[in-house]
Amino acid sequence: MRVMIADDSAVVRGLVARWIGEAGFEVVATASNGRIALESMSRTDPDVVLLDIDMPELDGTQALPLILAKSPGVQVVMMSTLTTRNADISLRCLALGAVDYLAKPESNRGVTTSDTFRAELIERVRVFGAARARRRPHAAPAAVGAVHIAPAPPQRPATPIVLRPKARTGIPPRCLLIGSSTGGPRAVGEVLEKIGSATLRQFPVLIVQHMPPVFTAVFAEHLGARVGLPAAEGKPDERIQPGRIYVAPGGRHMGLQGSRNDLSIRLDDGPVVNFCRPAVDVLFHDAAALYGAAALAVILTGMGSDGTNGARSLTEAGAAVLAQDEATSTVWGMPGSVAKAGLAQAVLPLGDLGPALRNLLTGHAA
């Protein structure tokens, strides 16, 4: 796995390079600005580029489209400190083709001492490097003399996907629940846009997207602008209303409380669930208890298995759960876990999920 690091801090470049090497990956280049990174692309051919936003000469936002044009398919992860400005820029970079973002501690000391930052960085290199390797064209083998090549070990058969029978409760949906992580900001926006604002105005939309604080508020603003509906982080005791989009705040679990006809947002700072806070499972468990069969949920692209236990609660309550397919997922962790557990009524490409959800919401599903 080949990695390029572009950051104007020599301390950050050195630390990150050391961590990546210790994890068993190869650092093929480091760059102090976007211009050097761009000039190094053809020579070094990285699988993953870690691209800082704020750099001299050519910053990350300027370099990103040029890097992608020069090396289509390279996996670019944006890095930035937790500010509203950088959150907004990072989300815009995702729309331009970056695969993910990584919140960076504000100081070099913070970078040095943050085990969380190190773990998240290595995990992204591992996941996106593997994704890039799968998509690379395989070169023809060079002509050699008689060489015995050991047979490859047999591949483990893929886990068969068994779809859950369609719910036949006769209870129409009263809300839409969305869980997502890596690759989610783009996916969520596309799904909501394809459902359409006319349909979304009739239902509350509750979203758990794995994101740090600050980013979730900006993410909500982007969604609201895209679909033309009020969208914001959920607030404690805020009443659930149709036509509004509620995003779980970074660093806090978002659930539901009250009775079926008088529901409100519940926020808590409890322990992480599935290594996450906010966690999809927290929202889904509450929705299963309070909406029951009147909930409709979808799990989109993301690492890990968050949402699987909550999806089980929803299906046991009679609700329908859909999942994104592997081919269109940035990472088929969360949706794959739900699909392999037999909890998904349908496993669909991203482009088909919006229309399918619209049909279920409006009662026009086959």
Which positions does each model-derived feature cover?
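Conserved acid/base catalytic micro-environments in cytosolic active-site loops
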Residues: 2-4, 9-21, 30, 35-36, ...
